[in-house]
A protein has these predicted regions:
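Conserved beta-sheet core of the metallophosphoesterase superfamily
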Residues: 151-215
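Accessory, non-catalytic peripheral segments of nucleic-acid enzymes
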Residues: 38, 42, 207-261
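Metal-dependent catalytic neighborhoods of phosphoester/phosphodiester hydrolases
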Residues: 14-16, 47-65, 77, 82-101, ...
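N-terminal active-site segment of His-dependent metallophosphoesterases
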Residues: 1-61, 65, 131-138
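Active-site neighborhood of phospho(di)ester-bond hydrolases with catalytic His/Asp-centered motifs
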Residues: 4-6, 43-48, 73-84, 102-109, ...
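Conserved catalytic scaffold of divalent metal-dependent phosphoesterases
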Residues: 81-161, 189, 210
């Protein structure tokens, strides 16, 4: 089996997100990934592992993850790893990652796995001329591409160019429910923004014999936003991280002290 995840968006120092809480959540996530990968032959990470050019603290998190990897792991870049057109800072992590753990292969150019029979189109190559057409459409493709979420989110390339592939496993859109056409998104394993309700996040388990797949959920802390009218209802939460919005008239709101919540 192949474990497929994407859109980790490792980032510390996000507004309203305590670094200690975020670090603990990443480590819980890493533990779940390592546990799940034990029953798999390979792990593919489909781009946007980082949210930006990483800080030293964010690199330390990444290195702590790959140091414990025990199964072949292929990592390719997404749009958040792009530095300029057709370039990615992942190129600077290839050798360092392999030196830390030879099982980790960072891919920054188009790649074909001859053994299992699939292609990898990193984001750095996505917008090159005929980049999609260079692949064998009889084989599955792994890539990082924005699909469509009507009415506001438009595809970044003509999705018809992927139509002849048996299946396309992709990073970018953060919800598995955005799976469309023959493009399957695992979604982001961790909420990267605050939601009103808990959302399902997860990963794909892919059978390389017939390229069938199943989606499974992660169990991780989430970022939640709640609206209250009484400041007494602003209750700190230990597992999830919750921030509060207070509704009321101007005089009432003026009397509320500033708080981390």
């Amino acid at each position: 089996m192949i474990l497929f995840t994407a859109d980790w968006h490792i980032k510390l120092g996000q507004k309203n997100v305590p670094v200690e809480w975020a670090t603990k959540r990443y480590n819980e996530f890493f533990d779940q990934v390592h546990q799940q990968s034990e029953s798999c032959d390979m792990h593919i990470i489909g781009g946007d592992l980082f949210d930006r050019i990483p800080t030293m603290e964010e690199l330390s998190l990444y290195f702590s993850f790959i140091r414990k990897v025990k199964k072949p792991t292929l990592v390719y870049d997404g749009n958040h790893e792009a530095t300029r057109k057709n370039r990615t800072f992942f190129s600077q992590l290839k050798q360092a990652s392999r030196d830390i753990n030879p099982l980790v292969n960072v891919v920054d150019i188009s790649y074909v796995d001859e053994d299992l029979g699939f292609g990898v189109l990193p984001y750095a190559d996505l917008h090159r001329k005929d980049s999609i057409e260079h692949f064998d459409t009889k084989q599955p493709l792994f890539t990082h591409v924005r699909g469509e979420i009507p009415p506001h989110v438009k595809p970044e390339v003509d999705l018809d160019r992927f139509a002849d592939f048996p299946v396309v496993f992709a990073g970018d859109l953060h919800a598995h429910s955005n799976t469309q056409r023959n493009i399957v998104y695992p979604g982001s394993p961790m909420t990267t923004s605050f939601h009103r309700q808990e959302v399902e996040t997860g990963y794909l388990l892919i059978n390389p014999k017939d390229w069938s797949w199943d989606w499974w959920p992660f169990t991780l802390p989430q970022l939640l936003r709640k609206t209250v009218t009484n400041p007494a209802d602003m209750i700190p939460t230990n597992y999830h991280h919750t921030i509060y919005e207070i509704e009321g008239d101007i005089q009432e709101l003026a009397s509320v002290e500033n708080t981390e919540l």
